[in-house]
């Protein structure tokens, strides 16, 4: 499917790279940003913002303009005057660059009139260490050797001459180290990187508030966040600003001073926040402007440097002229902007291990704070806000995932209903019935152009206009299967202007060479609701000429005047799926018209494919059961009544209760009293489809374990479901916490004898580490060394977060920033004296193996009760359990894949079957000969047999012999002839004749029972015999021996013996064994025989396989009640077929 977008980016399915699409948007927007920047620099006071945005969208900048623009954005030559900047060589600390105000701020400016030979106090090449007191330059030198210097920020330093304190905030650039120096307010208690706990305490209440909010309410989450940030920082206005799919922005939450105009609901064009600025927000999460009207300070640098130094990561970076003017126009003097990043969308490539790969980040939005007077926020408070935003990012990740899942579920439900309609009336039914195609994706109208007729829903173009669109698609997009665009104008459709704003966006799919389905969307502005006052021409922003939120809004409306809301990837996937179903349905319909019998011949192979899929699923399931039974972790399961139906060997070993004694007992009877409510909660949640995690239950002990006290388990509950997704029970995957609780009790009793625990060589001791109140490792026990691959000497004295567990290529790497944020919350919560929840924590060890664990942390105190750090335990599943869980995931995935495949096959086969039935209905009233009527009757029976097989989704009921059997009146000979017809293609191909041999009464015998199942089993046995018979060996004989029995005066039972005889040696013995004893490794043929044998048994019959010297035979013994005996003359049948 081709696509057309206003910014030339492709609309593709989720299997395409989301990262590539974002790159395309960046490439498209950057020249527009550069064009606007060039126009602003060239026009200054006469710059007309609204019209320039529209012009930039229509024309691009030259390559040289783009390069100059990016250079200016990333390598500006000015800083804000509230601090000073130093750039140094990373090894020698020789000065490479400095801001002009550095000498004055560091009190290096000479007070006397300088002489000619007096040396400058600060110059390129100066050893920066000489500018600070000894303890300060030692701290700077140590930080320079650290892998990630950002983790050590801020470093408290003191000027050598005056002793004035500064926060030194360091980051690396291509030529060395940049040091931002911010003066410390004497009334504030100075902190360093080790004072991160203080920063955490500042935001602790806000973090707890965010984490306590219910999921599924993004608006509430954003409202709470802006209020918390407002209380923390004191800014006059705080806004949550979200980037949409097409890169434009929207204010979705706001907390402001009552006298300020609201900006809630205001939309901004993508160019309002240039892509270069967004890149800077990804690099430097916090951007502070203390006074936009302050004169910026120039940076002086070494002439030998080939280009200006990069100040992307510097908080001191001065605002550009256009941004300063924008702030001034809206009455804002100071600002604080913090980025909100989330995990990038993962490509749906089917890689089962993708969830264990490190994830990239993308910019979701910004937290924007404005103040009407100059305002400075010290680093500790900025760090607290940044940490709060990281927590918010984790919450947003959850909300984005939940929203995507909800949307997919809605689309899948709608697709299912649409497929059902298609079976009755394709493709018109999806327009004439409810739900319809407009329920599949959000749109304002839809149209079906099919066989030169038109069906429409909602707001659509006229019939003539739709025909013009069809002609345009056939002429200019004939090579594609469809087109999607958010702007027909920019897609090049010549009649777009005539459509007005009613139809701007369109998704079209081709369901045949001349037939189309359309979805239409109106212009974006219709969706926009702004909470602010409406714009009046007499307002102070000069009718949109100045840069102001109002002019941004006006520019945005101008940009989207001919554009609709973009088509999301998940929506295009749904549309594309419907297209495939429709195309397949229409092709099958055409094929059935040309060849009515073709589908019947291929049906058995589809059936075997279904059975093969279930066989593979059964094999995986059996392997999973074996692993669970032998796992070294306790695993148990209950049915929906709460009775035990699974109890593995480890559970039996820990409790002393054997498997056979546990099965059938209520779980609540096996737990101690204080765990009864927990078990009931888990079961109630499971019945609602909610899976509880990390809950503690205590099991009673029995027999030889009775004196050891209860077994303490940390359990995760997994809902067990059948193929229809109905919850049928709960499986508990547990960790034995008894040993850890013993250790924790001992730890509590000894009150600080930590070393005795950590260095204990007992295998009961789990992986343990300790940190001090600064976040550095103090202890790292042997179990931690084994699981992480990091030796004790390499962990001790290292920062736990940043050096040991990291997002970089050294230490133990975690999947994403969110994991480190959660770990930081856990450590800070403990050290601040609170009781934290256990943390599900995953990381890659030094061998690259992904480890999943449950982390428990508790505070460490000294003799006076002062908190000195944290003691942490890791609970890791055994390799056997990890493998079992992996197999379980594979099993669930295989089950879902098989279910989807089977559903698709069953769905697709119904269409040709319906076509065949329709053809049959046309033929029945015709004047047919007796022979033709018999052929038609056999054809009907084949179709009905195939339909019966397609409804077999519960093989377990067949195996247990309680599948439902039909009861109909049928003619036995017609059923037998149908069996022979099914074998004819294979018989003719192998040139093996099939003889039939049955007495005269069979032809006129009408019985009562399930004729279709009888046909199925006899046809399966016959096909198996044909497979293992060679042409030269002789014919196959289908023999029927009936015996009638009178039951009372009015009822007869027909005892039937079917003998299917073929020449020796016959069917291999291994296959016959598979027929009677199902095994996980059974072949397709063996599984077919096994199912047929079970069906015969369900009919109260038996199957035998007899080997003789000359021949071998399947012998099927069944009985049916006689419905009636025909009075017409019966003839014996002994002919060849």
Swiss-Prot record:
Q: Where is this region: Disordered?
A: 1-27
Q: Where is the Histidine kinase domain?
A: 904-1124
Compositionally biased tracts (Low complexity)? 1-18
> Which Cys residues form disulphide pairs?
none
Q: Name one GO cellular component term.
A: nucleus
Report TM segments: none
Q: What are the protein's UniProt keywords?
A: Chromophore, Photoreceptor protein, Receptor, Repeat, Sensory transduction, Transcription, Transcription regulation
Cite a single GO BP annotation: regulation of DNA-templated transcription
Q: Where does phytochromobilin bind?
A: 322
Fetch the SMART domains from UniProt.
GAF, HATPase_c, HisKA, PAS
Task: Name the family.
Answer: Belongs to the phytochrome family.
Its recorded name reads Phytochrome C
What is the organism field in this record? Oryza sativa subsp. japonica
